[in-house]
Amino acid sequence: CANKGEGLQRWLQEQAILAALTLPRLEGESEEDWLSRVVSDSKETAKSAAERGTQIHGVIEAFYEGVYIPELPTYVRAVETAINEHFGSQLWVSEKSFARGGYGGKCDLIAKNCVIDFKTTEKDLDKLDYYFDHQMQLAAYRQGFEMPTARCAIVYVNALQNKAKLVEIPEDDLRIGWDCFTHLLAFYRAKNKL
């Protein structure tokens, strides 16, 4: 289990460095203007990645809702295979939400005693594991859905390679995630006088 915040920060830094390497300073351009262009370019890369992720999530959601998709992307079948091989055939419900206990959430995919969240990436799936934030997120979801013993997993989707990888979070890590989440929720409530 890694720290998601560190991974995201590293990715953002890498995007800024790549932008700096691929955007030469224009003749007569001040350093301030060049840096502004570099930052703008790296933000655009992050925005595009987020939009791709939203689009991929939407296609997977539509598939699990039974919407006819004339040209089903190959990565959707990779997701279906990964889930079915791990959890077996289930009646899945997508984008289910809850609000109770002072917090709420929306789960990408839920079945009887299973909670799944999709994460899109362009990285090599063999090198990916779940992050600590995922432990807390899914532990909070299963409690919010009143399924305290639900199995929880992250499904990484690489649409460029048409691959998916399911990583189930061990029960011990989910218990730790729930403990940490409840402490953070109590802190938030106290800080905000709720």
Over which residues does each language-model region extend?
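Mg2+/Mn2+-dependent nuclease catalytic core
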Residues: 92-192
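Metal-dependent nuclease catalytic cores that hydrolyze phosphodiester bonds in DNA/RNA
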Residues: 1-104
